[in-house]
Amino acid sequence: MNRTKTRRRGFGISWGIGLGLFVALIGCMAFDILQREGGFGKSDDVLVMGTNAGFKPFEYKQGNEIVGFDVDLAKEIARSMNKELRIEDMSFDGLLPALESGQIDMAVAGMSVTPERAKNALFSEPYYSASQRIIVKKGSPIRNRYQLTGKKIGVQLGTTGDTLAGKIAGAKVSQFPTAPSVLTELNAGGVEAVILDDAPAAQYTAGFPDLEILPGELSSEHYAIAIKNNNHDLLEKINRVLAEMKKDGRYDNLIRKHFGAAALESMKKKELES
């Protein structure tokens, strides 16, 4: 055996393996950077919407498809930009991190604008006015917000209802991934009350005959579309589309489609009074 040739061959193999590992390492680093910057796996022809599809009538599953007011709104935005809309369904509390990492372009998920959220994202002009409501089982001794002290309260994780419940003295707050899951827990007696946005509360409690929504609002809020902090170009485009939709009637058509004619009339009346 020629030992010199063997050594050279061994050196060549080792050098080749080392080079391969180096290239793989560089590739992994580039992949990570591109993902964080939102530049990997995303085409210029695609607009990625992040949402939490358990919030009817804004976003919910119909068979294998995610539909709702927010979805139709996002489709109009994508169409105006000559882009295809892609929807990423995820937990509500994961939306802003996904926005920051570049996994999604915008979060359209019935998201209320709050000072805390505004620290981590840009927000479009408001597209819907909402409020938080209390839901209880019929016959419950809880009749108003003041009687929530020390009670077991169910909320959807990461929502403004979650924040409100956390401020109630002595409250034992249980967090759930979706609106239907927290109402199911209330119906089963696992919690004594639920704090939830008004429109989903009305939609989902219709399927629970033993539940009722108490009169009175816990808060007044505005939904808006969240965009990554430095993406002012996309923010400007979204605001322009929202303004055009409100002007040409497309926005009213979506309200009528998802909430009914009576809701549209009520909304118009409130606008005139304000």
Labelled PLM ranges:
Residues 97, 111-119, 164, 187-188, ...:
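A ligand-binding cleft/hinge motif common to bilobed small-molecule-binding domains
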Residues 59-62, 74-83, 145-147, 158-178, ...:
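Ligand-binding cleft/hinge of the Venus flytrap
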Residues 53, 128-136, 198, 202-243, ...:
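Periplasmic-binding protein-like
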Residues 75, 79, 84-147, 212-217:
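Acidic, polar ligand-binding/catalytic clefts
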